[in-house]
Amino acid sequence: MNFSVLNWNIEGSKYYTSTKLSKIIPHLEKSTADIFCLQEAQELREKILISNKLSNFNCVFPENKKDRNIILSKFPLINSGEISFPIIIHSVLEKAIWADIKINEQIVRIYNCHLEIVGVGPKQRLEQLNFIMEDAKKHLGPVIICGDMNTTIPVAGWGRKFIQLFHKVTNNNLITDQEYFHKDERHIFLKTAELSGFQDAINLHDSTWCIMPIRWEIFKLKLDWFLVRNIKKPEISLGKYVSDHRSILAKF
């Protein structure tokens, strides 16, 4: 079963790092990926319909046009849906979307996620990850969970204090487990995924986010993940910074 998936947070529209679609679309059209999982893609919906290449893909759009995750697939879509996370602090939350995709007579379940960031911390993101992995138990075949997981909390120190202040994260939302309290958030996130049988295809110490336009990888944060279960780990290629996130191409 040979196929490829491109995961990418394309826009960065929430903050000062907003990226113009005119820079993003050519990269998508040149990509050889069979499946795209895109975050912050709410402005892309109309562009897809008029793109010579992307308009030929099968699409999973959220029901609410303000929701920002999209899945595009060259392969047939068997089923799809949305996951609304339990309310944490907001009345409007990020959601995850999923699709069952038929690839060479096998059904692959793909989740495209964008986890919460403002006013929440590792505790809440782990709850959201567990919520997705619990849903994934319904599918016995290959499962992929990818997206911008916003694992933003660095090792204990001034950098962590800065991130907490910037994203309004209280100490109560941090991990209190002594083994992980002083570590970067990515370590407890990976352990939680592995306990449910998932492997991460991206190097744990890779940085996937920067401050644009200067491309400063402050704190060397790994926000983007590619978790797999019941399928071989893919080869990963990290793209250059066109948005504030690297694109991630996974070849199976």
Task: Put a short name on every predicted segment.
Residues 99-102, 109, 125-155:
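His/acidic metal-ligating clusters that form di-metal
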Residues 2-12, 81, 107-117, 146:
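Active-site-proximal beta-strand elements of phosphoester/diester hydrolases
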Residues 1-52:
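N-terminal, active-site-proximal structural segment of metallo-dependent hydrolase catalytic domains
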Residues 58-73, 88-93, 122, 153-160, ...:
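Active site of divalent-metal-dependent phosphoester/diester hydrolases
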Residues 7-21, 83-91, 116-121:
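Acidic/histidine-rich helix-loop elements
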Residues 35-116, 238-239:
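Structured beta-strand-rich core segments of catalytic domains in phosphoester-bond hydrolases
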Residues 13-15, 42-47, 118-121, 150-156, ...:
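Active-site environment of divalent metal-dependent phosphoester hydrolases
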Residues 36-40, 61, 144-148, 199-203:
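Active-site neighborhood of phospho(di)ester-bond hydrolases with catalytic His/Asp-centered motifs
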